[in-house]
Amino acid sequence: MSDNHRLDGKVALVTGAGRGIGAAIAVALGERGAKVVVNYAHSREAAEKVVEQIKANGTDAIAIQADVGDPEATAKLMAETVRHFGYLDIVSSNAGIVSFGHLKDVTPEEFDRVFRVNTRGQFFVAREAYRHMREGGRIILTSSNTACVKGVPKHAVYSGSKGAIDTFVRCMAIDCGDKKITVNAVAPGAIKTDMFLAVSREYIPNGETFTDEQVDECAAWLSPLNRVGLPVDVARVVSFLASDTAEWVSGKIIGVDGGAFR
C-alpha cells in the first residue's frame, strides 16, 4: 500500500461503528495503521468484536459508548478519545437511523427522532471533532444518494435529514480551513447491511413480497456494474478521504452507489 494511503500514527474515531458500514470503516482505518475508537450506542457486544478484529490486524482499538444524538455525550466521547490515545486526527460520522412514512402520517416525534441523530447529531459530531482534533485532521460525514439525486416515496424525513449534511459539508469546509482540517461526506446508495435488508422493500414498488435474493437483484440492476454495494465499498472511500492523498479534497460529497444514479 502506498505510504500516502497509510494512516500510521493517526487516531480515528468512527461513530455508529458496531455494525454495518461503520464497522467496515473502523476495520479499514485500522488495517491502514490508525488506532481506532469504535463508538456504539447500544450494540456493545458487536462493537467489542470490531475492536478484537482491529487488534488482530495489528493496531490498537477501544470501544466507547455514547449517544451521538446528545451533544454533551458527543463532547465526552471526543474528550475520552483524546485522554486515551493522546490526540485525534480522523472522525468518521456514521451513526444514523432510517425512516419511511407518507407525508400525511409523519408525526413531530418521528421527525425529531430522525433529525436528532442524522442531522443534529452529525452537526455536533463535526463541531466537537473540530474542537478536539489536531491540525490537518479529517472530518467525514455521511449523507445519502437519496439526499440530492433521487426522490423516494415516503422518504422525505430521512432524505431531508441527510440533505442537510451536504450543506453542512460545504460550509464547514470553510470554517475548518484555519486548522487545515478537511470536511467531506460520503453518500452511499444501496449497501447490503442488516439495516438495508430490514427496509429495502420500501424502496421497491410492490416489493413487500420480495425475497432477499430478489432485493439483491433489484439493487444490482440499478448499477451498471451489476452487483450489490457492500460496506467495504464505502469504507475504501472513507479511507481515501482520511489519508494524506486526499489533502486537497474538501467540501465535497462523494457518491458511493456504483453509478446507480447518474
Swiss-Prot record:
Pathway: Mycotoxin biosynthesis; aflatoxin biosynthesis
UniProt xrefs under Gene3D superfamilies: NAD(P)-binding Rossmann-like Domain
Keyword Mitochondrion in record: no
Binding site residues for NADP(+): 21, 67, 94, 127, 158, 162, 191, 193
Active-site annotation: 143-144, 158, 162
Lineage summary: Eukaryota, Fungi, Dikarya, Ascomycota, Pezizomycotina
EC top class, as a word: oxidoreductase
Function: Cytochrome P450 monooxygenase; part of the gene cluster that mediates the biosynthesis of aflatoxins, a group of polyketide-derived furanocoumarins, and part of the most toxic and carcinogenic compounds among the known mycotoxins. The four major aflatoxins produced by A.parasiticus are aflatoxin B1 (AFB1), aflatoxin B2 (AFB2), aflatoxin G1 (AFG1) and aflatoxin G2 (AFG2). Within the aflatoxin pathway, with the cytochrome P450 monooxygenase aflN, the versicolorin reductase aflM, is involved in conversion of VERA to demethylsterigmatocystin (DMST).
One GO MF term attached to the UniProt entry: versicolorin reductase activity
Origin: domain of life: Eukaryota
Compartments reported by the entry: Cytoplasm, Cytosol
GO terms for cellular component: cytosol
Gene Ontology BP terms: aflatoxin biosynthetic process
Keywords: Cytoplasm, NADP, Oxidoreductase
Methyltransferase recorded as keyword: no
Protein name: Versicolorin reductase 1
Record EC number: 1.3.1.-
Catalytic activity: (4S,8R)-2,13,16,20-tetrahydroxy-7,9-dioxapentacyclo[10.8.0.0(3,10).0(4,8).0(14,19)]icosa-1(12),2,5,10,13,16,19-heptaen-18-one + NADPH + H(+) = (4S,8R,16R)-2,13,16,20-tetrahydroxy-7,9-dioxapentacyclo[10.8.0.0(3,10).0(4,8).0(14,19)]icosa-1(12),2,5,10,13,19-hexaen-18-one + NADP(+)
Major location category of this protein: cytoplasm
Family classification: Belongs to the short-chain dehydrogenases/reductases (SDR) family.
Induction statement: Expression is stimulated by gluscoe. Expression is regulated by the atfB, srrA, AP-1, and msnA transcription regulators. These factors bind respectively to the conserved motifs CRE1 (5'-TGACATAA-3'), SRRA (5'-T/GNT/CAAG CCNNG/AA/GC/ANT/C-3'), AP-1 (5'-TGAGTAC-3') and STRE (5'-CCCCT-3'), present in the promoter of aflB. Zataria multiflora essential oil reduces gene expression. Expression is repressed by curcumin.
